[in-house]
Amino acid sequence: MAETQVLLETYQGQGNNNATNIEATKAAIKKMLVRIERFQTRVRKHIDENYVDFMPNHTSPDIFLEKSSALGDEISDLLATVGNEGLSVLSDASVELAALSRDLREKLFGLRVSEHILKLDDLFQCVEEAKSTKDCLVVLDLMGRLRSLIYGEGTSDDISPDVERIFQSLECYESIKVKYHVQAHLLQQNLQERFDRLVQLSCKSFPTSKCVTLLISKDEALLQDIVIALFQESYNPTKLCAFLLENCIEPLIQKPVSVEYNVNAKDGTHIQLTLSYSIKEPDTSSLLRPNYKDVFEHFRLLLKTLCGINSSLNGTQHVFTVIGDHVKERMLQLLLDECLIRVPETMDEYNSSTLCEDVAEFEHQLVDTFLINPELDTTLTEFTKQFDTYYRNRLSERVLATAREIIQRDLQDMTLVAPSNLSANVASDPLLFPRCMVSKSAQVDFVKLMERVVRQPDKAAEGTPDPLGGVIGLLLDAYINEVPKVHKKLLKSIPQQSALFYNNCMYLTHWVAQHTKDNIDGFPSLVKILQSTGNKHLRVQVSYQESILMDIMSSFEFENPHTLGTAPLRLVRQCLRQLELLKNVWQQVPAENVYNNSFCELLQAFINELVQRVFSLRDISATMASELSDLIDVVLEKASILFHDKNDVVHVRSWLKLQQLKIMMNASLKEFSELWCDGVGPLTANYHADEIKHLIRALFQDTDRRAKAITQIV
C-alpha cells in the first residue's frame, strides 16, 4: 500500500514540498500502472491459451482472481484518496499526473473485464470438478451461473453494462459461448444416459404380439436428482411420451393386455412392469376390448410403476404434468370413445352399475398424480354428468345412435323446401307447407330415418310388443331436447340458427301430421311440443333482437332543447342497420309470414320507443320539429325496404302512428284541429286527447290561439 501512503502525504504537506510530493505521486501511479500491465499480460496469456489458441494450460484461475481482487482494491483506495477534487488540483499542478490518474481508472475498468473472464474460467473448472463427483444438481447450478455471466441474464454479480459490453466484443467471447454450449450439450447427454440407466423402457415386437417392459430404479434420491436436472435442462420429453402413449396407454384401453407387476425386480433394486398384447387386427374388435375396470386397474399399475420419476419441478408442475400435456388429450378421448361408451343396456345392469363412481375415483387418481388438470380436463366429469343420457340413448339401440349423430350436424347446412308454396298458396290451403329453408340434417337425414322406421315390416309375432314401438316418439323427443343443448350457443348468438330450428320443428310437425295413419304414439302431444319448442326458440331470438334495439335506444337523449343534434339520428340509423343485418341473414330462411310477423314485432317495439322519446319533450322548437320530421322520414324510408313487399310494412301496428307524428311535426294549430276533428278525425285512431294536447303545448307558444286549439281537443 506504499502508493496510497504517498498520496496521503501529498495532501498533508502541500507547502514547499508540493513539487516533490507530486513527483512522488506520479512515481507511485506509474509503478501501479506497470504492475497492472504485467498482471494483464499474464491474464491475457491465460485467456488466449484457454479460449483463443486452445493450448494446454493447467494454471488455476483462482490465483489470478485473488491477485485481480487485491489490485482492484489498491487502485480503488488510490483513486479514492486522490478523489475528483484532488485530481483537479493535481491537474493544475501537473498535466502528466492527471493523465496518469485517468489511465489508472481505465486500467481499473480493464481489470474488471479481466476479472469477469476469470470468474467464467473458474466456473468452467468448477463444472469439471462437479462432473467428476457426478453431482448433477451442482453442475446444473453452475451452468446456470455461467449462462448468467455470459449472456447477462439476471446475474447476481454487480457487473456494469460497460463491462458486459466490452466483454461481449472480445475475441474470446465466441469461444466462451461455444465452450458453454458444448458443456450444456454434454450435461444434457450425460443426464439422458443416466436417466436411461435408471428408467429402462424397452419394447420387443413379434409377428403377432408385442412385449413392453418398464424397469424403474428404486433409488429414489438419485432418480429424483437426475429427473429434476434433466427436465430443467431444456429436456424434450416427446420421445418418452410417445413411447408411453403408443406402447402402454393406447393398448391398455384398446386391447386385452397381460400385465405383470414385480416390485422386487433385479434383486429388489428395481420395479418392473411387463405388458404383453396382440398386435393383430381382430375381426370383431369390440368384443375383444377390455372391461373398463381392467383398464382402470392396469392404469393404476402403470402410474404406480412410474411414480418414482414424478418429481416436483416447481411449485405448480410435476413430471407427470409435462407428460400429461403430451398424452392426456388422446388418452381421455380413447377412454370416452372406446372404453366408457359401453354403458349398461338393461335396467338391471343400470341399477347394479358402479360406472359413475369408478370413473370419478379414477379421475381423482389422475388428478392426484398431476396427469390431468381438474379445471381444464373435464372429459371424465362430463361423462358422469351425462351418464343417464347415454343410458337412455342406449335403450333405443342403433337407430337412436344414428339420430344423435344427425343431431350433431350443423343446422346451417340448409336446403330450400316447397319452393312453389308461396304465402298466397298457403293462405288458401293450410295443409301446404310454406316455402322456407330447412336444415339438411332435419329435412333429409332425420326424416329419412323416421321413414325407414315406419316402413319396417311387422315381423313380430302376434301378441308380442313391437321392438321399434314408440321409436318415432323417442326420435322426435330426442330432437326436441338435444338440439337446443348441442347448439345452445349458436341458437342464442346466430339469428339464422334459431330461424332454421323453428323451420325444422315446423317441418317435422308437418311430417307427423302426414303420417297419422302410421299410429305414431303420442301424436297430439308431439305436434304441440314440436310447435311450442320451435316457437320458443324463435321467440327467444326475436326478444334478443328487440333487446339489442332497446339497448341502442337507451342512449337516445335530447341534449339541446333547441336542436336535435347528431346523436339521435345516429342511434336511429344504428337500429335500422341492426334490422337490416337481421334481414340479410333471415330474408330467405323463414316462411314469408313468419319473417313479416317477426319484423313487424321488432319495428313495433322500435317505433313505440321512438314515439315515447318524442313525447318526453316538454318544449319542441321549430328547428327541432323540422329535424324530428326528417328523422322520422329516415325511419319511414328504411323500414319499408325490410320486407319482401314494401306494402307489408303497414301491418306494423304503430306505422300509421309514426306517419301521423311526422305530419304533426309540420302541422299548424288549425291542422291539428282538423286532424282531430272533434274526436272523429284520423288522429283518434292512434292518439289520446292528452297526447295531442301535450304535443300542441310542446310545439306552440302559449297564446290565445293555442289555448283555443287545446280546448277543441276533447
From Swiss-Prot:
Transport as UniProt keyword: no
UniProt keyword Cell division present: yes
Subcellular location: Cytoplasm; Nucleus; Chromosome, Centromere, Kinetochore
Primary subcellular site in the record, as a coarse category: cytoplasm
One GO BP annotation of this record: mitotic spindle assembly checkpoint signaling
Family annotation (Pfam families): ZW10_C (PF20666), ZW10_C2 (PF22766), Zw10_middle (PF20665), Zw10_N (PF06248)
Function, in words: Required for accurate chromosome segregation.
Family, similarity comment: Belongs to the ZW10 family.
Protein name: Centromere/kinetochore protein zw10
Organism: Drosophila grimshawi
